[in-house]
């Protein structure tokens, strides 16, 4: 089978390419340039070239910087401007890795696209990985349903520690087993505010309000805060911890309250992405990557919006984040929180 492998220069994509080549497939590597960091790309391309030469496979360098800027980077900036919390990895998977890269794979005549994600596929549905601590099914839930039939996740049945051990047994790949893992958001080196600083003044002080609308303190600029944050702002006369409940970007205000006020029992979604045919769901939902799943009921409307009613309340629901719905270990839907 002819397979394009997304190669980043990391241990996961390296072992992915190795495994598929060893199974006798015709493997082609591809490194994606997503943002303008020449030194970063130069270092990673050297690693990809080293692996490609060792495996005796061809590889391509695909410049997707413009697509990445339009579909991922600027929406990241704009979402924070709106006082919401973006999910750039979900957008990148949908439009870039499982979008533009898949188009490129097809243009080469490849039957499949393989990535080093920790996830599995079964009956055209994404499943959680064997290694729960590294499971990436949440971020892959933004994928177009039609893309799934072309995907392979060779590491889905492996533990991360075993992937590293495997690489360490092969002389040429030993260095990949010990290298530092990439950061969660590839274009954020330290904090997301440093990215926003390139486009706007993030340090404009504003008012802190309580849930009744009373001014109770000051903050250092609304973009420094996300829903649920409890530090970095002043609340005069507070006798218990206060958390960000809401952000009002137009007035440069943040609304704060107690943990009890942060509690949510239902919420709305826009643009629900369904992997099964259904008008309502009885399932579990994750409201962010590292959160535990919560039982819920989902009512789906004609305009692809949805209402989610939770069995147990959750804390810190952030507009702009992705909610992912599971039937046991299978992803059945996703959507962005309004």
Curated annotation (Swiss-Prot):
Keyword set, alphabetical order: ATP-binding, Cytoplasm, Disulfide bond, Nucleotide-binding, RNA-binding, Transferase, tRNA processing, tRNA-binding
Binding residues for ATP: 6-13, 32, 116
Main location per the UniProt record: cytoplasm
InterPro entries: MnmA-like, MnmA-like_C, MnmA-like_central, MnmA-like_central_sf, Rossmann-like_a/b/a_fold
GO molecular function terms listed in the Swiss-Prot or TrEMBL record: ATP binding; tRNA binding; tRNA-uridine 2-sulfurtransferase activity
GO biological process, one term: tRNA wobble position uridine thiolation
Annotated function: Catalyzes the 2-thiolation of uridine at the wobble position (U34) of tRNA, leading to the formation of s(2)U34.
Listed name of the protein: tRNA-specific 2-thiouridylase MnmA
